[in-house]
Amino acid sequence: MQVTVNERDAVQSVATAHPAANGESHGHGMDKLVIEGGHRLSGEIVVSGAKNAALPILCAGLLTGDPVDLDNVPNLKDVRTTLKVLNQMGVKSETDGCRVQLDASRVDNLVAPYELVKTMRASILVLGPLLARFGEAKVSLPGGCAIGARPVDQHIKGLQAMGAEISIEHGFIEARAKRLKGARIVTDMITVTGTENLLMAATLADGETVIENAAREPEVSDLAHLLVAMGAKIDGIGTDRLVIQGVERLHGARHSVIPDRIEAGTFLCAVAAAGGDVRLTGVRPHILDAVIDKLREAGVSIEEGDSWLRVKMDRRPSAVTIRTSEYPAFPTDMQAQFMALNTVATGTAQVVETIFENRFMHVQELNRLGANITIDGNTALVTGVDKLSGANVMATDLRASASLVIAGLRAEGETLVDRIYHLDRGYDRMEAKLTAVGANVRRLSGSQA
């Protein structure tokens, strides 16, 4: 049966209707960050594991009854939510710092409920593994950041090609299949979570699956490397054509999550904006090529080693034009941070967003700080100004909140960033890491604010 979902309607009603309710459910209530601008940054920052690799990797624990031992897992809201979803299904998990051990030998509930899924779209990633190992799954339609339409349809079409019967009723995706069959799947758009879901499902399918137009993101490759360690047979890792020979069962494995290239890029932009000399450790520079190239174009000095980067900046940046696209091009998740950098640059630059609609919500907030940005469709025109001045601003989504922190580090006076529960979804204690290199940033908890 064919299913089409207008996912935007399902998503927007959740994401925009209750920003406050969303915030209260995030543990910290309505925390704020207070930033006093004008401090240079110097010292060392350790980059955490990648959120966008950790989430699918945690879900891959569902594919085996053996223990899966993970390291370098970031301590983030979205990770904790994913673990809650898994725990509700009967997965046992033990967390010790950055280590997480999963045991999915006694899964007894194949439903991912709305209360958990609505705060995080990545919960859709349990669909493929549950269907492949248990033959059925029921997953609530997702929520998460309020950024335009997301392509759940691609997941559904791919699983249907592998023989799954899927219906959408009462806000749930319900799927069943005796055993998935290998298939050739061509997605009509590149989708990271879609590639991950289909890749996990294919590992236990009967026969060969070919995923054409697969996402090439390093986080997809990291998931693939874990699956191979668990006994999966996958060719073409890192390319847009993944070939999977299904196996009867997967076994346990140990795996260390790759470093977060977006967190690393965010700190590079922070130093570029505030000025200073900072060493980032625990990084993989080669997966940051597009970002590093653009920073060098802006006049930033960057040295790279195997697992470190040193970033130095002692002048005003030059404006750089960026255009977001799929990996290995410039990442949409770094667009807002570069917009913040361009606000204080010399010259004028275009920022073109080709991946998500509705991803310029930070523009009016940056303009409140004195930036000069105009929007025309999917393009923002940024004319650099001599100085920004601190003001009260509000975070609207994860990367927008990072851009406001970067702008605040550069602005004169005090900037107050409200609703930073968005920031906590993707950054592990950002204010602590910035404070350690000389920034003046402090968190006000909901009660003080």
UniProtKB/Swiss-Prot annotation:
Record's subcellular location: Cytoplasm
EC nos: 2.5.1.7
Binding site for UDP-N-acetyl-alpha-D-glucosamine: 121, 150-154, 333, 355
Catalytic activity: phosphoenolpyruvate + UDP-N-acetyl-alpha-D-glucosamine = UDP-N-acetyl-3-O-(1-carboxyvinyl)-alpha-D-glucosamine + phosphate
CDD domains with a match to the protein in the record: UdpNAET (cd01555)
Gene Ontology biological process: cell division; cell wall organization; peptidoglycan biosynthetic process; regulation of cell shape; UDP-N-acetylgalactosamine biosynthetic process
PANTHER family named among the record's database cross-references: UDP-N-ACETYLGLUCOSAMINE 1-CARBOXYVINYLTRANSFERASE (PTHR43783:SF1)
The protein's name: UDP-N-acetylglucosamine 1-carboxyvinyltransferase
Lineage: Bacteria, Pseudomonadati, Pseudomonadota, Betaproteobacteria, Burkholderiales
Gene: murA
